[in-house]
Amino acid sequence: MLAELSIKNFAIIEELTVSFERGLTVLTGETGAGKSIIIDAISLLVGGRGSSEFVRYGEAKAELEGLFLLESGHPVLGVCAEQGIDVSDEMIVMRRDISTSGKSVCRVNGKLVTIASLREIGRLLLDIHGQHDNQLLMEDENHLQLLDKFAGAEVESALKTYQEGYQRYVKLLKKLKQLSESEQEMAHRLDLIQFQLEEIESAKLELNEDEQLQEERQQISNFEKIYESLQNAYNALRSEQGGLDWVGMASAQLEDISDINEPLKKMSESVSNSYYLLEDATFQMRNMLDELEFDPERLNYIETRLNEIKQLKRKYGATVEDILEYASKIEEEIDQIENRDSHLQSLKKELDSVGKDVAVEAANVSQIRKTWAKKLADEIHRELKSLYMEKSTFDTEFKVRTASRNEEAPLVNGQPVQLTEQGIDLVKFLISTNTGEPLKSLSKVASGGELSRVMLAIKSIFSSQQDVTSIIFDEVDTGVSGRVAQAIAEKIHKVSIGSQVLCITHLPQVAAMADTHLYIAKELKDGRTTTRVKPLSKQEKVAEIGRMIAGVEVTDLTKRHAKELLKQADQVKTTG
């Protein structure tokens, strides 16, 4: 949810910070006070089109900042992770500065991002619906996802089964495409990898060979130093009156007194052990001295061999193991190319089999969607009826993603289909608002009043299905009154149960339904107009709703009417 909004030097707003709560927040006030400016600021904050005209006159830039609180597992967390944006304590701070040149600087949790990134994140946080806005529900490409969310676990399970087969199908299709490349490309490829395999095999590499050779080279290169040091060490220990003799004498002396007490016994054992360790070391030194031999030809061979391995590493892998793995891989590829026809037939047969299985799963997903689409239509008809649009008809149009006849494509009901991650369906919500009128897409609903009610009916069902945390209605109640106005108010309240809702309204019925009522007013400050926001108390709500009813003068009658609306709203909230 949008927890706090800060605006500075934006249009007529000098500086303003507004806190928002859960549930339904309404913004009311006189025309021109700045209600829509606040919504404009929110729209720009989440990636809307900016302009230098938004910068307050005489200032260098406009500054917008919003704090969003998230629930764990919200999809926006994944998007932020992909973009390297750190999100701690499940909070996102979005900021956008707009200069007088029209350029924007955008940040999310302090990280600079592009407008496109800001918009991508914003779409998952806010859904703004105004009289002319295109928003999530009006965009056809979102309808499949919304239908799947409405269908829930049943379609989710079927889709998961389908996607497992689909991934296997895609891999096979890729292998088939690689094998089906032109003869000339295949011939060139075969020549190349045969040469590479011959080069690797002729080297007769062994695992860890390079490490062993480097160790041996180190030893031969330091022959003189190793021999001299070993000889000196051996002489120091083994010559007449050498170190080993002195340690032996010390051990014998301590042995004579070792049974007097425990400390002497331990001391004797320690020196005795040291003697045997040193004696063993001298044997090893002698053996190594006898084996040491300087062989310049061996050193030359090692250098040549290491250089050969180095050249192979540069071409085929960082280690000998990598080179051998690459050799195994291209050996398999050579076999596939040389036996291409056989592999092609085998692969086509497997692809055809998998494709048939996947097509069955795709058809199953499609059928489940169609079943739930009917349930969705029934629910939306009920919602529209409660908004006094009982003559409206809602339906979901299904089209199959078709493939051309010359493609290697699986068949569903005898028709070649194009498989995608989400199945074979193209889904679009359609509506007719009057008897006898044809069904058309949501974006083609002409009447502002009708569009408002249609969107509210759909949103009352989908508000809990959408990923957005906040929904904004900007004067969606235009062109309605009376019982329709009351129905709209109740529907907006219903939407606010599942999502935070901010609503600019001119309808007293909607204002009465608010959990939080913010009054937007203009005031003069240092000879300039600015905007202020005031949360209304219960008594102030009565006065403001009375003003909305009366238009100008608030009378005792309009106050009574306002109290009646508030009482009615409380009853609606209580009964649900």
Swiss-Prot record:
Q: List the disulfide bonds.
A: none
Q: Which CDD domains match?
A: ABC_RecN
List the keywords (alphabetical).
ATP-binding, Cytoplasm, DNA damage, DNA repair, Nucleotide-binding
Q: Which residues bind ATP?
A: 29-36
Q: Subcellular location, in the record's words? A: Cytoplasm, Nucleoid
What is one process in the GO biological process aspect for this record? double-strand break repair
Matches recorded under Pfam families: AAA_23
* SUPFAM superfamilies listed in its UniProt record: P-loop containing nucleoside triphosphate hydrolases (SSF52540)
What do the Gene Ontology cellular component annotations say? Answer: bacterial nucleoid; cytoplasm
Q: What InterPro entries does UniProt report for this protein, alphabetically?
A: DNA_recomb/repair_RecN (IPR004604), P-loop_NTPase (IPR027417), Rad50/SbcC_AAA (IPR038729)
* Recorded family membership: Belongs to the RecN family.
Subunit-structure text: Forms multimers, possibly octamers; these become larger following DNA damage. Recruited to foci following DNA damage; probably interacts with RecF and RecO.
- Relate the protein's function as given in its record: Involved in recombinational repair of damaged DNA. Seems to be the first protein recruited to repair centers, foci that are the site of double-strand DNA break(s), followed by RecO and then RecF.
* Protein name, as recorded: DNA repair protein RecN
